[in-house]
Amino acid sequence: MIDTLRPVPFASEMAISKTVAWLNEQLELGNERLLLMDCRPQELYESSHIESAINVAIPGIMLRRLQKGNLPVRALFTRGEDRDRFTRRCGTDTVVLYDESSSDWNENTGGESVLGLLLKKLKDEGCRAFYLEGGFSKFQAEFSLHCETNLDGSCSSSSPPLPVLGLGGLRISSDSSSDIESDLDRDPNSATDSDGSPLSNSQPSFPVEILPFLYLGCAKDSTNLDVLEEFGIKYILNVTPNLPNLFENAGEFKYKQIPISDHWSQNLSQFFPEAISFIDEARGKNCGVLVHCLAGISRSVTVTVAYLMQKLNLSMNDAYDIVKMKKSNISPNFNFMGQLLDFERTLGLSSPCDNRVPAQQLYFTTPSNQNVYQVDSLQST
């Protein structure tokens, strides 16, 4: 299982930053020797990012490998063009990393960040790497003309979001029982389907069925009456602070809203019990339930994984792998992954290495009806 990551200190030799004014000047000048790396969750990157930046949102499941030195930075890109661009330019360009907000970082307080880990790794690999003071929030507030915003493209049901490579080492598309396992020592660029061909970056067009009554989707799925009717969805769990419950006044759907942003400071785990209870209520009434956030890759995934952990007695890794097999572009932020680890300890669950659930018991490992998981046997805990 994943251990809690040790802090990566911002040693004085690596605590080097660039201001947003400096970055704006470089962009105004058209500096072609500038490589921007956006370290925020994929959902935030797709909503808006600094022009020309490439996304390196790293799921917590991969950070330990990176920290131990088992994973080069170039392996964090599954998109060939991004990987080639990084490999070609990292040795000569000025590399600038940014997260959502890093204005208060210093040598003593920046230790537990993804940026701290990446900066150290980049410098170890000989790159001239810096972090952006104030992060994306400060840059966008002062120089929004150099930000690219995509308000309509944040949902995977309309266009496939950029995949997060850190999870490429997981086997995600096979009917064999061994494919539930997290094969973290494989080359993360070698993920293949069951026939050995490279995995496609395309994502499902509609909500993904995790269990016969449980669907994982995005904001647009929650506004499509045809989709909701097709899947028998009458319960909608909205894991955002501000997206509207569109059909709430019609009386046909039951809503629950969890007011959480996709940010490292948010405590999503405090809502696990009521979210799990809401999903169970839908199951008890033989209704479908849609769990959604904005893009359907972070907050809603975290809640879905928590549900599988508690109701099926699965470790975090096993539950995560199941959702990953169904929807390959998931990317919960680092803090949410840590909360799932804490939830695993609270539930007293074993590591996946010690307590694998046999594949014949899992509905989601095969389309064969002979291996359907008996959902009615789920017991509340």
Swiss-Prot record:
Domain Rhodanese: 30-148
Domain of life: Eukaryota
InterPro entries named in the record: Dual-sp_phosphatase_cat-dom (IPR000340), MKP (IPR008343), Prot-tyrosine_phosphatase-like (IPR029021), Rhodanese-like_dom (IPR001763), Rhodanese-like_dom_sf (IPR036873), Tyr_Pase_dom (IPR000387), TYR_PHOSPHATASE_DUAL_dom (IPR020422)
Region (Disordered): 176-203
Record field: catalytic activity: O-phospho-L-tyrosyl-[protein] + H2O = L-tyrosyl-[protein] + phosphate; O-phospho-L-seryl-[protein] + H2O = L-seryl-[protein] + phosphate; O-phospho-L-threonyl-[protein] + H2O = L-threonyl-[protein] + phosphate
Chain ranges of the Tyrosine-protein phosphatase domain: 206-349
EC number, as in UniProt: 3.1.3.16, 3.1.3.48
Tissue-specific expression: Expressed in keratinocytes (at protein level).
Ranges of compositional bias, category Polar residues: 189-203
CDD domains, per the entry: DSP_MapKP (cd01446), DSP_MKP_classII (cd14566)
UniProt subunit comment: Interacts with MAPK1/ERK2.
Family: Belongs to the protein-tyrosine phosphatase family. Non-receptor class dual specificity subfamily.
Free-text function comment from the UniProt entry: Dual specificity protein phosphatase, which mediates dephosphorylation and inactivation of MAP kinases. Has a specificity for the ERK family. Plays an important role in alleviating chronic postoperative pain. Necessary for the normal dephosphorylation of the long-lasting phosphorylated forms of spinal MAPK1/3 and MAP kinase p38 induced by peripheral surgery, which drives the resolution of acute postoperative allodynia. Also important for dephosphorylation of MAPK1/3 in local wound tissue, which further contributes to resolution of acute pain.
Protein name stated in the entry: Dual specificity protein phosphatase 6
Provenance organism: Homo sapiens
Gene name tied to this protein: DUSP6
